[in-house]
């Protein structure tokens, strides 16, 4: 799927910011931007899969959001999940299943 250059630039910034804070297994874009139906109220929905060895995903999410706030131009909804949890939940009726099936893997 081809995204607008402004959105692609934002995704590049998001990906680089995440990679500066952790070593993600993968990063997914999901929601309205992934579905090709964003509107003026849409945020950028991002799900980051991190290694199981990542100790504190809540603190990591706060740190990444802080770093993203320095330059982002659109609102971002950032979720972080450990790899084993993502792998386990992507086969059930969960958000992870929607992300795995309908999201766009932008890294990993």
Where are these regions (language model features)?
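Catalytic core of pol beta-like nucleotidyltransferases
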Residues: 1-26, 35-40, 51-108
């Amino acid at each position: 799927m081809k995204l607008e250059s402004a959105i692609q630039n934002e995704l590049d910034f998001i990906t680089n910011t995440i990679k500066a804070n952790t070593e993600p297994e993968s990063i997914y874009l999901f929601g309205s931007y992934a579905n090709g139906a964003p509107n003026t109220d849409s945020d950028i929905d991002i799900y980051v899969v991190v290694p199981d060895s990542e100790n504190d995903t809540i603190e990591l999410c706060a740190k990444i959001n802080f770093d993203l706030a320095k330059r982002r131009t659109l609102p971002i909804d950032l979720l972080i999940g450990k790899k084993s949890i993502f792998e386990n939940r992507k086969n059930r009726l969960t958000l992870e299943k929607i992300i795995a099936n309908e999201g766009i893997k932008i890294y990993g």
